[in-house]
């Protein structure tokens, strides 16, 4: 996992998509035009967390290196240092795999 030169703010998380399988279990190769974007990724960077009503910092539950699942339309796609990444709020993450 390459270190990126970007620090997200507040409760935002930077995620790199994990490539989907290019072949089905039955051996059929899926063309790029038929592939859906994967909804699984690896956390690359995390912000410090959000603040509650009293102003107290609430740290983020996920950490760098976690493998996460997120919604189909979650996050904003960016390109940073030649890598396609997603920036999303922690609340867009549905869970940690493994």
Swiss-Prot record:
**In UniProt terms, what function does this protein have?**
Together with the chaperonin GroEL, plays an essential role in assisting protein folding. The GroEL-GroES system forms a nano-cage that allows encapsulation of the non-native substrate proteins and provides a physical environment optimized to promote and accelerate protein folding. GroES binds to the apical surface of the GroEL ring, thereby capping the opening of the GroEL channel.
The similarity comment for this entry is: Belongs to the GroES chaperonin family.
Q: Which domain of life is it from?
A: Bacteria
Tell me which SUPFAM superfamilies the record gives: GroES-like (SSF50129)
> What's this protein's name?
Co-chaperonin GroES 1
Taxonomic lineage is: Bacteria, Pseudomonadati, Pseudomonadota, Alphaproteobacteria, Hyphomicrobiales
* Record-linked Gene3D superfamilies: GroES chaperonin
Which gene specifies this protein's sequence?
groES1
- Quote the subcellular location field of this record: Cytoplasm
Subunit-structure text: Heptamer of 7 subunits arranged in a ring. Interacts with the chaperonin GroEL.
Keywords from the named record: Chaperone, Cytoplasm
